[in-house]
């Protein structure tokens, strides 16, 4: 796996799924291929994206700044600086300075990532802030190692939280999760259907699922009732995906 592929993988792991994720993936690919060379326009686009957390925007802004060639005097962006200040916690800043001193002696991506993984996400973000604000300088490889370590810390905590939701025994949460998954899968099918021969069938299955979810939410149902919806939709999807040759996300 090349260095830039690895960076793209880690950064995208902290971006919520949806159309915006696909858009960000495309921007990263363009930036890494040297196609997107206007940093100002790119940063303005990033600043106005909805859904993304300030920290995710800060990390993406840091990656874009590292990768896109720019004028030396180009102003640093406030939204990136604010995101990479470690929540203003002096403890994070102290640790960031210690980490920076270690990284300064490092020259490889993997070496930097290994060192950085022993620090908290707050300290890692503060260290990125030091480099972003030109208070310290490291090689691009080392900076990317720092980025990937930060994303790994964030993705780990997101995964723990997601696993808790998926394995919860609370029937109300499981019920709502099934309905949300049914709705998002229906939406994905409608988007995919545009160019396929089976478009009418896909739209029909998606529409039925959507109506069922709407009815359940309106009249209220027993938390176990959505299990049937999940099974029916899954059966329809599996038949559809065999013909389409597409692997759909499985329901939990």
From Swiss-Prot:
A motif (Nuclear localization signal) lies at residues 101-105. InterPro entries: Flu_matrix_M1, Flu_matrix_M1_C, Flu_matrix_M1_N, Flu_matrix_M1_N_sub1, Flu_matrix_M1_N_sub2, INFV_M1. It is a peripheral membrane protein. Residues 165-252 are annotated as: RNP-binding. It comes from the Viruses. GO terms for cellular component: host cell nucleus; membrane; virion membrane. Keywords: Host nucleus, Membrane, RNA-binding, Viral matrix protein, Virion. Its main location: virion. Residues 1-164 are annotated as: Membrane-binding. Gene3D superfamilies: 1.10.10.180, 1.20.91.10. Changing residue 41 to A: Induces short filamentous virions. It is found in: Virion membrane; Host nucleus. One of its GO terms (biological process) is viral budding from plasma membrane. One of its GO terms (molecular function) is structural constituent of virion. Plays critical roles in virus replication, from virus entry and uncoating to assembly and budding of the virus particle. M1 binding to ribonucleocapsids (RNPs) in nucleus seems to inhibit viral transcription. Interaction of viral NEP with M1-RNP is thought to promote nuclear export of the complex, which is targeted to the virion assembly site at the apical plasma membrane in polarized epithelial cells. Interactions with NA and HA may bring M1, a non-raft-associated protein, into lipid rafts. Forms a continuous shell on the inner side of the lipid bilayer in virion, where it binds the RNP. Most abundant protein in virion. When expressed alone can form virus-like particles in transfected cells. Belongs to the influenza viruses Matrix protein M1 family. This is Matrix protein 1. It comes from Influenza A virus (strain A/Wilson-Smith/1933 H1N1). The lineage of its organism: Viruses, Riboviria, Orthornavirae, Negarnaviricota, Polyploviricotina.
